[in-house]
């Protein structure tokens, strides 16, 4: 699904870092001459998932089963046996290997009493996906202590369909429910833009982040990947990107 992702997404090479309103660092990562696709592409997760499902439909070796839930897993020396619950009932499924990609709260990891180790950071961040027509270049901009949001950090980059992802550091002591309200979000964006341009909020969320991982990613016939195995800061889509790297490594 690399081609539809690259063609629909926003390609970029330049990243700029500012301290207040002064640029202090800049990179320009050009793809190698023999690379077929750009080095970095920004694309909303729902489009990426659409591309994945479309590609899976072209591969007869993959059986994608919707509305199904793994309710138990049993291991032996040479296989894993899953109990699957679906609208038609419950059935068993055997596999030589089970790739566990069920997210940060991984029910399967918990079934086996396994844990992740690391640190949860006491900080909160506001994500706002904003639809607007802007003449900003398709670059990643990152500010420390900007005049429009003093004492915190802000991240800006472009996605498909004129959607701009803005990430505001808020600190730990804020009220997450209050900060998600439009009357709190809109003034922050207006202060950042510094003009009266029109924009529309597409999506708003508050998150905290952690840096944690399992001590071992392989447990018998189970192979843990993605957020089930390790959790990182979401900056730069590190969670999704590292999950893809995990599965590519297995392949």
Where are these regions (language model features)?
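General small-molecule cofactor/ligand-binding pocket signal
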Residues: 6, 63-65, 117, 202
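Conserved FAD-binding catalytic core of PHBH/FMO-like flavoproteins
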Residues: 54, 97, 101-209
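Short, conserved active-site loop motifs that form the nucleotide-linked donor/cofactor pocket
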Residues: 62-63, 68, 222
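Short, hydrophobic/aromatic-rich segments at coil-to-beta transitions
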Residues: 78-82, 138-141
């Amino acid at each position: 699904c690399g081609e539809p992702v690259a063609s629909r997404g926003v390609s970029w090479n330049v990243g700029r870092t500012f301290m207040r309103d002064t640029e202090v660092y800049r990179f320009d990562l050009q793809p190698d001459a023999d690379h077929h696709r750009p080095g970095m592409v920004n694309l909303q997760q729902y489009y990426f998932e659409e591309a994945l499902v479309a590609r899976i439909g072209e591969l007869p070796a993959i059986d994608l089963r919707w509305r199904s839930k793994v309710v138990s897993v049993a291991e032996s020396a040479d296989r894993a046996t899953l109990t699957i619950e679906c609208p038609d009932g419950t059935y068993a499924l055997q596999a030589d290997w089970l790739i566990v990609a069920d997210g940060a709260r991984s029910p399967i990891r918990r079934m086996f009493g396994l844990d992740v180790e690391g640190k949860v950071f006491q900080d909160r961040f506001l994500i706002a996906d904003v639809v607007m027509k802007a003449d900003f270049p398709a670059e990643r901009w990152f500010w420390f202590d900007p005049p429009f949001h003093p004492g915190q950090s802000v991240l800006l980059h472009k996605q498909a369909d004129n959607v701009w992802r803005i990430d505001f550091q808020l600190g730990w002591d804020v009220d997450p429910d209050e900060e998600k309200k439009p009357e709190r979000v809109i003034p922050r964006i207006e202060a950042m833009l510094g003009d009266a341009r029109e924009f529309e909020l597409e999506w708003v969320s508050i998150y905290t982040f952690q840096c944690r991982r399992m001590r071992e990613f392989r447990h018998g016939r189970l192979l843990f990947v993605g957020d089930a195995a390790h959790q990182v800061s979401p900056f730069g889509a590190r969670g999704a990107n590292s999950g893809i790297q995990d599965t590519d490594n297995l392949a």
